[in-house]
């Protein structure tokens, strides 16, 4: 059951705008924020085939990661035809993203980065 339906979080607005172009695959990175550090915890990908999901649904899904997280970054990606990315390609893109994040946490700003309440976040240089 959704917990934020109708609240209109930054995430909900982002998803609605992005989905107007059709289904996509989202690379997701969960992070722990302990000022001044941002540490990646877990990553995954999901295929977004509809916009009936909201931030509350996402939070419920991300509970399955088994970690307490402070932020979630979403990196939408599409195949060459503008649709869903095959699983194997999504896994490869996720590994590339993980490598880039190990080198530079500011990469999080290239995605859509949200706190636990679905509000926009941004990583600042220390």
Predicted regions span which residues?
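Helix-rich interaction surfaces within compact, conserved domain-sized segments
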Residues: 61, 86-126
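Short, solvent-exposed beta-alpha or beta-beta edge segments that form flexible loop/patches at the rim
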Residues: 9, 46-65
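Short, low-complexity cationic-aromatic patches
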Residues: 16-24, 60-69
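Amphipathic alpha-helical interface surfaces
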Residues: 51-58, 69, 90-93, 97
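N-terminal, charge-rich interaction modules
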Residues: 1-43
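Mid-chain, well-packed structural core segment of small domains
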Residues: 63-92
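Short, flexible beta-strand-to-coil junctions
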Residues: 29-36, 75-80, 116-117
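The transition from N-terminal targeting/processing segments to the mature protein
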Residues: 27, 36-48, 71, 102-105, ...
């Amino acid at each position: 059951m959704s917990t934020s339906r109708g609240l209109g979080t930054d995430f909900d607005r982002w998803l609605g705008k992005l989905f107007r172009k059709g289904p996509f695959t989202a690379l997701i990175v969960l992070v722990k924020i302990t000022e001044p550090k941002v540490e990646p915890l877990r990553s995954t990908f999901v295929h977004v085939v509809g916009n009936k999901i909201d931030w509350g649904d996402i939070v419920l899904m991300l509970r399955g990661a088994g970690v307490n997280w402070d932020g979630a970054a979403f990196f939408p990606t599409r195949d060459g035809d503008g649709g869903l990315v095959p699983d194997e390609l999504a896994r490869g893109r996720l590994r590339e993203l993980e490598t880039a994040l190990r080198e530079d946490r500011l990469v999080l700003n290239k995605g859509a980065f949200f706190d636990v309440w679905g509000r926009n976040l941004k990583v600042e240089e220390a």
